[in-house]
Amino acid sequence: MVDTKALRAEQLQRASEISLQDDIASESVRFIAGADVGFEQQGEVTRAAIAVLRYPSLELVEYQVARVATSLPYIPGLLSFREYPALLAAWAQIQQRPQLVFVDGQGIAHPRRLGVASHFGLLVDVPTIGVAKSRLCGNFEPLGDDNGALQPLVDADEQLGWVWRSKSRCNPLFISPGHRVSVGSALEWVQHCIAGYRLPEPTRWADAIASNRPQFQRWVRKSPDLLGKHRDMI
């Protein structure tokens, strides 16, 4: 039996430790990573992929994939506890340490202000940004259809992040700071990493690696110096 009350209390405690102050200078950023988590075998296995890109060229230089036994069932609002063990396993293999990590999921745009981007950022003490494909909490004004349409994502008087249409005729992204990044800078960093697709390059590559998409296979074939491996911990 999962003690959900204790996990929610832990979320509130950890959320109080989140910093929304910018802790990185743009000139010091050499590598930005993207992280994506998925599940296999009817949820029995958790798979995390981390892609490391050189900044500002956004060239993929390293990837790591880890598969671990899933330790927690799916419980709404507690997803980060289910995902972070695989993220930590993939992170432990990274050789080119990034100065910033984009996580496919929520940052502080979470009912208890601790989405997976915030939780992971705290655990590894690295600046993080949540880049989600859907809204978990918060409200926003109607969004225009054009590329670049933008609205604040708010809960009462608190701004949690942004709703941004990164590509016309595509659903918007829900961007929120994870840890050691401000609300304003979270948006700016994501905008700096867009290269013609809906997703920013760090999480687009992480998704491609996790799913072993053709674009990733082609990159591996033409990039003999690319660092990367898959690791099973099951």
Swiss-Prot record:
Source organism per UniProt: Yersinia enterocolitica serotype O:8 / biotype 1B (strain NCTC 13174 / 8081)
Protein's job: DNA repair enzyme involved in the repair of deaminated bases. Selectively cleaves double-stranded DNA at the second phosphodiester bond 3' to a deoxyinosine leaving behind the intact lesion on the nicked DNA.
Single GO BP term: DNA repair
Reaction catalysed by this enzyme: Endonucleolytic cleavage at apurinic or apyrimidinic sites to products with a 5'-phosphate
Residue positions binding Mg(2+): 36, 104
Pfam families: Endonuclease_5
Recorded family membership: Belongs to the endonuclease V family.
GO MF term list: deoxyribonuclease V activity; magnesium ion binding; RNA endonuclease activity, producing 5'-phosphomonoesters; single-stranded RNA binding
Cofactor: Mg(2+)
InterPro entries named among the record's database cross-references: Endonuclease-V
Keyword field contains Hydrolase: yes
Cellular component terms per the entry's GO annotation: cytoplasm
HAMAP family reported for this sequence: Endonuclease_5
Enzyme class, UniProt record, top EC level: hydrolase
Major site of localization recorded for this protein: cytoplasm
Keywords: Cytoplasm, DNA damage, DNA repair, Endonuclease, Hydrolase, Magnesium, Metal-binding, Nuclease
Name recorded for this polypeptide: Endonuclease V
Site residues by UniProt (Interaction with target DNA): 74
Compartments (UniProt record): Cytoplasm
EC numbers for this chain: 3.1.21.7
Domain of life of the organism encoding this protein: Bacteria
